[in-house]
Regions:
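TRNA-recognition modules of translation machinery and tRNA-sensing kinases, especially anticodon-binding
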Residues: 27, 130-428
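N-terminal alpha-helical targeting/anchoring segments
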Residues: 1-134, 149, 153
Length: 428
């Protein structure tokens, strides 16, 4: 959510930003906010005048009573009661206008960074840099589900019987490899100075409203029937939610946290769920990182955060590239976002394995996350980034370390988490 003062003073900039995001259907919201804001300010002024008049009359009543002029005092009391009625009606209007403003402000996208390329969808995202040479093997690499099944590590049929499409059983060495990746990622981030956290896996609706747009919520979140609770789609939501309504000490900034959690997603929309495989599913595990920081530090943190993901993948010899997300591919709260993509030797192309975003103060405004200083308080900036998200990461790992004999070499950094195992061999 943007600053209403900024919108009030710069409506043309806000409208131009909406156009850059190809959301012209939202242009009317700016004028409507200005209209309701004007009405609310007039009502606020009237309320101040009524309260001032009431205070003056109340003092006069006291003087009249002390001087024995009870009848005159009673007449003024009647006038005060009339003012109270007007104030009640006025306050009702204040609340109504505030709700009208908020409902519209929540739909207006955050101001994107000047460096964001303009484009309607992810086909217009711009490559920033490649890291590592893409592997082009002379032998055929099987589909990732086939590799996992050859290692007796995946059972999709059983998962389908138990839960339907979009779920899986990981078994044996593949399950161990999955855990090894997450354990390595956890230690990697702790060594970067981040505080490890295991957060709640459900959040209330007011936190959902604070961390994402309605469109994102509808496409992603599972609601618990009969409860004001939603299953998290990423631990970023509950980690950022930890700071909801908090007044943070400037001396304790920044807050840098990393967490492991299961994630649950509807995956509604154009992509949907894979019929067979583990690339896009309803339930998966992820190591996430978030930063809550001073506004002037957020862009430095943004560059650090995506570089950590690149470093993690390169430590396992997986080639990656970074992409600058274009304006139309940014969710409404994001000012700038960078995707990290891993190389797929089987498909001979890159695929998304993580995303880093700077939301500037948009999320903090929704959640009321402020920094305390001597002269007033101000909103913090929030950022989030995927450290690693198995099983997508497993797809990249298995394909890039697949050998012609069907075995898979374990990257050296993961071997301590696999009991020293160097290679996974197909089961006969």
């Amino acid at each position: 959510m943007i600053d209403i003062k900024f919108l009030r003073e710069n409506p043309d900039i806000v409208k131009e930003n909406i156009k850059k995001k190809f959301q012209n259907h939202k242009l009317h919201l700016v004028d409507e906010v200005i209209d309701f804001d004007s009405k609310k300010r007039a009502v606020n002024l009237k309320g101040d005048e009524l309260r001032s008049k009431r205070n003056s009359l109340s003092s006069e009543i006291g003087n009249l009573m002390r001087n024995g002029k009870k009848d005159d005092a009673e007449a003024i009391k009647a006038e005060v009661q009339q003012i109270n009625s007007e104030l009640a009606e006025n306050e009702k209007l204040e609340t109504e206008y505030a709700e009208e403003i908020k409902s519209r402000m929540m739909k207006i996208p955050n101001i994107i960074a000047d460096s964001v390329p303009i484009g309607e969808d992810d086909s217009k995202n711009v490559e920033i840099q490649k890291y590592g040479d893409p592997i082009v093997p002379e032998y055929e690499i099987p589909y990732h589900a086939d590799i996992m099944e050859s290692l007796c590590g995946l059972d999709l049929d059983a998962a389908r019987r138990v839960a339907g499409n979009g779920f899986y059983y990981l078994v044996g060495d593949i399950a161990r490899l999955h855990s090894a990746v997450l354990s390595y990622a956890r230690d990697f981030m702790i060594n970067k100075g981040f505080t490890y956290c295991i957060p709640p896996y459900m959040i209330r609706s007011d936190v959902v409203d604070g961390v994402m747009s309605f469109e994102e919520m509808d496409a992603m979140m599972y609601k618990i029937e009969g409860e004001d609770l939603y299953l998290i789609g990423t631990s970023e939501h509950s980690m950022i939610g930890k700071f909801k309504g908090q007044l943070l000490k400037k001396s304790e900034m920044p807050y840098t946290m990393t967490s492991y959690s299961p994630c649950f997603r509807k995956e509604k929309g154009a992509h949907g769920i894979e019929e067979r495989g583990v690339y896009r599913i309803h339930q998966f595990e992820k190591q996430e990182m978030i930063v809550v920081c001073e506004p002037e530090e957020s862009w430095d943190w943004y560059d650090k955060m995506w570089s950590y993901t690149v470093e993690l993948f390169r430590s396992m010899d997986i080639p990656v590239r970074t992409l600058e997300c274009c304006s139309g591919d940014l969710a409404d709260l994001k000012a700038k976002s960078c995707d990290v993509e891993a190389w797929s030797p089987r498909q001979q192309k890159y695929f998304e394995v993580g995303s880093c975003s700077n939301l500037t103060d948009a999320q903090a405004r929704r959640l009321g996350i402020r920094i305390k200083v001597e002269k007033g308080n101000y909103y913090a900036h929030t950022l989030n980034n995927t450290v690693v998200a198995p099983p997508r990461m497993l797809i990249a790992l298995l394909e890039n370390n697949y050998n012609e004999d069907g075995s898979v070499t374990i990257p050296e950094v993961l071997r301590p988490y696999m009991g020293g195992t160097e290679k996974l061999v197909p089961k006969k």
